[in-house]
Amino acid sequence: MTPGTNAPQRMIIRNARVFDGVNAKTQDNVDVLIEGSHVVGVSSAPVAGDASDGVIEIDARGRFLMPGLSDAHVHLMGNANSMMEFLQGPTGALYGNTIAEAKRMLLRGFTTVRDMGGDTAPVKSLIDRGVFEGPRIFPSQAMISQTSGHADFSFVYDVPEEFGGAPSRTEDIHFTRVADGVPRVLAAVREQLKMGASQIKLTLGGGAASMYDPLNTLQYTSDEVRAAVQAATDYGTYVATHVYTPAGIARALDAGVTSIEHGHLADEATIALIAEKGAWLSMQPFAEDDHHYPDPVRAAKNTEICNGTDEVYGWARQHGVKTAWGTDLLLEPQSAPRQSVMAARLGDFYSNAEALTMLTSGNAALFELAGERNTYRGAKLGVIAEGAWADLILVDGDPIADLSLIADPDTNFALIVKSGQIVKNEA
């Protein structure tokens, strides 16, 4: 609020070169007016108002103003904590580390993220209420897995719950949920929705981070996947699936899955099928050193996944697949800042303008499929336009000419605004 009034705080960013998140062509000499948490004006004519009116004025001096960045595949709790902390650390420390990482992620310019596994609904609530700073979060809550699936982090001789065993540690902290059979899958999906999930995350194949499942494994029967999709659809939202292989992707699409997470081992026919079905491909431009696996089995799986990246991006472009960008950094807190490096790496596969569009309005189009589970649906995300959320970054330099600028936000982001609040100001 403006001091002494009930009016929302007004801010004017003057003389900006605006990339609106949609159009590759920027607009010069633009004033952007913010009232409260929303953009209320984008004008090539000077906007009236100054400090005497209680207005915060920021002179962009012709610099590049863009929407806040987004990441379609984070594990915020996983970014912030190591595997040993997950398995043995105090639960309170897990959440403390997560809240601290949320602030660091916001300072990297990520104003919105879709969390694909972890108990982040309470973190989202605290951030949305202004208790802590961090990005907007679309939580999936626990990753749902079959026994011996990608999100089964129990120890090898632990007795599964199906045979009378206890939940694993990662289930106790709501990072994963192991569920076998249609009734338990339905219950698991509904459990995550009860806890505040915007969308549902199911694991349908092997992965690099998991110990018991080679990459070629098919996980969950078609009936189990359809059950998850039905339960999510009944709540007005969708299912996203961790899956790499053609067979796994085909099973997911046949069951009505909306978002294919990863897909790095797909063939061209499978990518064309994603386009035909109108589904999304949520990809990550992995390099081998993004993750560090100490054992040769998981290291080899990581290499195989990374080797598929170039072809899949090419086929996705060729077939017009709706593609989102994310990172999927997990269980290595020291690697969390690579989020910015991976965003810049998107320029290896798309033009810089296309990459920036995907990082802003493109990802937002996927997030919005959560329907009424999207608690931010009162305004547009990922754009600079009248009525949009006021999530903005002022960049020293031109990322359309040099996308590597976004890899170093500490140096190159002069101003970060989220929901009309200044997070960083070195303008």
Name what the model sees in each region.
Residues A16, R373-A427:
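C-terminal cap of metal-dependent C-N hydrolases
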Residues D234, N307-P399:
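His/Asp/Glu-enriched, well-ordered alpha-helical/loop segment
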Residues M77-L94, K103-L106, Q141, T147-H174, ...:
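Active-site gating loops and adjacent loop-to-helix segments of metal-dependent hydrolytic enzymes
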Residues N97-V123, G134-M143, A197-S210, Y238, ...:
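Divalent metal-dependent hydrolysis catalytic cores, especially in the metallo-beta-lactamase
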Residues T2-M11, V18, V22-M66:
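Histidine-rich, glycine-flanked metal-binding segment
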Residues R63-R129, S148-S154, D223, A255:
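Metal-associated gating/positioning segment near the N- to mid-region
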Residues D119, D128-R251:
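Histidine/acidic-residue-rich, glycine-tolerant segments that coordinate divalent metal ions
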Residues T203-E311, Q318, K322-A324, L329-L331, ...:
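Active-site core of metal-dependent hydrolases
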